[in-house]
Amino acid sequence: MIKLGIVMDPIANINIKKDSSFAMLLEAQRRGYELHYMEMGDLYLINGEARAHTRTLNVKQNYEEWFSFVGEQDLPLADLDVILMRKDPPFDTEFIYATYILERAEEKGTLIVNKPQSLRDCNEKLFTAWFSDLTPETLVTRNKAQLKAFWEKHSDIILKPLDGMGGASIFRVKEGDPNLGVIAETLTEHGTRYCMAQNYLPAIKDGDKRVLVVDGEPVPYCLARIPQGGETRGNLAAGGRGEPRPLTESDWKIARQIGPTLKEKGLIFVGLDIIGDRLTEINVTSPTCIREIEAEFPVSITGMLMDAIEARLQQQ
């Protein structure tokens, strides 16, 4: 029997209709896996050994009562076959410390999804720089004058922090906007933090597409997140409307070009953000949108993921 651990935000607070981690747990349980639940505070290192206080978990598709704990134990993480790192951002120093603990278990043979080193290496905004032929025009800087020059060149730009999620602190600055200076100062904290500028993509009106990639293989359907009521952000957390769709030809092209790199880096479950035919983000920490896509199309994304995990476990 496969022992699967999951590190996540409190399961009592999730919305099971939309929660991708919950969908993964349902599929793992359906396959007869033993589920071990952990929050960040349950992980610890003792004399170099990664351990955790885990609670054995049962889950069910029931909006009143979706989980129950059936046991608890303190164990070496190396006792688990696979651990899903599903803690939501912020990607802060605490998150980084947790990846080091998980890496100690990985060295003993536990499969970590996604690979701890790659979680540290691949910032969701900056990692797109390795695929700059696929992205919008992009500037990463702390320098206000450079931001101003970029804005003057493109006249309609998007500014965002490198560590936000859910559309937080994303600004659109159009031609003649008197607020560029204050936005630049706010995002860079007066030149002490990097931010990202990209030329505005009018295709956002048709949606910001979340394309999921499972161990290098694109899922054939995506979720387009369409901005509502004059918003420039499609993120569901910012009020965008989700619309599942088949991948377009350019979606396939982008996902297939990036897929082999993701696989090689042990990034087994990844969400690409695509606007029109441009890649804007590579989400590696805790990608979502499984449930919305599975509800609309005959595809089991969680099945693809567990198949990929089982294949990797057999290779070890």
UniProtKB/Swiss-Prot annotation:
Top-level EC class as recorded in UniProt: ligase
**Binding residues annotated for Mg(2+), in chain numbering:** 281, 283
Self-association state and partner proteins as the record states: Homotetramer.
The family database entries (InterPro entries) matched by this protein are listed as: ATP-grasp, ATP_grasp_subdomain_1, Glut_synth_pro, GSHS_ATP-bd, GSHS_N, PreATP-grasp_dom_sf
The record places domain ATP-grasp at 125-310
Q: Known consequence of changing residue 227 to V?
A: Loss of activity
Binding-site residues for ATP, renumbered to this chain: 151-207
- One Pfam family hit: GSH-S_ATP
Q: What is this protein called?
A: Glutathione synthetase
Please state how the activity of this protein is regulated. Inhibited by 7,8-dihydrofolate, methotrexate and trimethoprim.
What keywords is this UniProt entry annotated with? ATP-binding, Glutathione biosynthesis, Ligase, Magnesium, Manganese, Metal-binding, Nucleotide-binding
Matching entries from PANTHER family are given as: GLUTATHIONE SYNTHETASE, RIBOSOMAL PROTEIN S6 MODIFICATION PROTEIN
**Molecular function per GO:** ATP binding; glutathione synthase activity; identical protein binding; magnesium ion binding
- Into which family does the record put it? Belongs to the prokaryotic GSH synthase family.
Cofactors needed by this protein, per the record, are: Mg(2+); Mn(2+)
Biochemical pathway? Sulfur metabolism; glutathione biosynthesis; glutathione from L-cysteine and L-glutamate: step 2/2
The UniProt record lists the EC number as 6.3.2.3
The note describing how and how many cofactors are bound reads: Binds 1 Mg(2+) or Mn(2+) ion per subunit.
What does UniProt give as GO cellular component? Answer: cytoplasm; cytosol
UniProt xrefs under HAMAP family: GSH_S
Q: Which reaction does it catalyse?
A: gamma-L-glutamyl-L-cysteine + glycine + ATP = glutathione + ADP + phosphate + H(+)
Q: Which GO terms describe its biological process?
A: glutathione biosynthetic process; protein homotetramerization
